Every structure is written in C-alpha cells, then in structure tokens.
C-alpha cells in the first residue's frame, strides 16, 4: 500500500527517539549516532524493530545529523545506505500485522542561513538534496 492511500483511512503511529535509546545502549557523548548504522547495525536494527513491534507504522532512519557538512561524500553514502538497510531489516523482521513504512530522517544542517549565518540558501538546498538523493537510492 502507498503511504498516501494509508493516510486516507488510518491513524498513523510514528516511532520515537533514537538518540536517547542509543545513549542507553552505550553511545558516548560527542560520538555521532549516525556511525552506529555501520558499527552497531544490529543494535540500531533492534531499536527500529521494537518500534514496529510496538505498533509504529512509520519508522525513521538513524540519519538525523547525516549531511555533507558533517560527513565526507563517501561516509555519507555509507551511513545513509546502512541506515536504510537497517530499517528494512527491522521491517522484515517485525510481524505485528500493521502496515510498515520508512521515513528518511533529515535534521538541520547545524549552520545558520545568511544573513544571520554564513550558509547560502542554495547551498543549504543542495545539502538537503544530496541527503534525499542518497536516501532515495535505498528505495524507501
């Protein structure tokens, strides 16, 4: 079922926080949670599955801070690819009978736009577009 069709006749339940759960699992202060998609994939996948099992229809990838200002192009591609794969594994493993969708979680760049900051609007658009393109290759 397409998400748009699901919205017409259902109440949508979303997942909850990822960062706080990763901290409970050992994420250290200052450590990027996005790296856990690669280094602790089973932990991230288990968190996603727990949300699906609890009845969430939409689970977000662990990519809130994943952007080209924080990570190299190679890192960003690996992180987002792994993040999408982790949620897909969780979706496949969950058998609660609910419809299950995946959302690409995109947070702020961490920079202010001009004139308050130094980031050009067009550069910000490209930063977000790159993240979306990488997420889209994962066929969310």
PLM region spans:
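Domain-level signal for soluble alpha/beta catalytic cores
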Residues: 1-140
């Amino acid at each position: 079922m397409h998400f748009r069709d699901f919205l017409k006749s259902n109440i949508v339940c979303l997942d909850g926080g990822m960062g706080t759960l990763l901290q409970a699992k050992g994420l250290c202060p200052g450590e990027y949670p996005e790296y856990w998609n690669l280094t602790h994939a089973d932990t991230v996948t288990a968190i996603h599955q727990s949300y699906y099992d609890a009845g969430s229809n939409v689970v977000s990838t662990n990519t809130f801070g994943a952007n080209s200002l924080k990570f190299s192009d190679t890192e960003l591609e690996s992180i987002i690819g792994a993040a999408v794969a982790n949620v897909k594994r969780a979706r496949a493993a969950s058998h609660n009978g609910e419809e299950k969708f995946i959302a690409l979680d995109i947070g702020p760049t961490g920079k202010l736009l001009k004139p308050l900051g130094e980031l050009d609007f067009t550069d910000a658009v490209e930063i977000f577009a790159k993240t979306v393109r990488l997420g889209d290759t994962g066929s969310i």
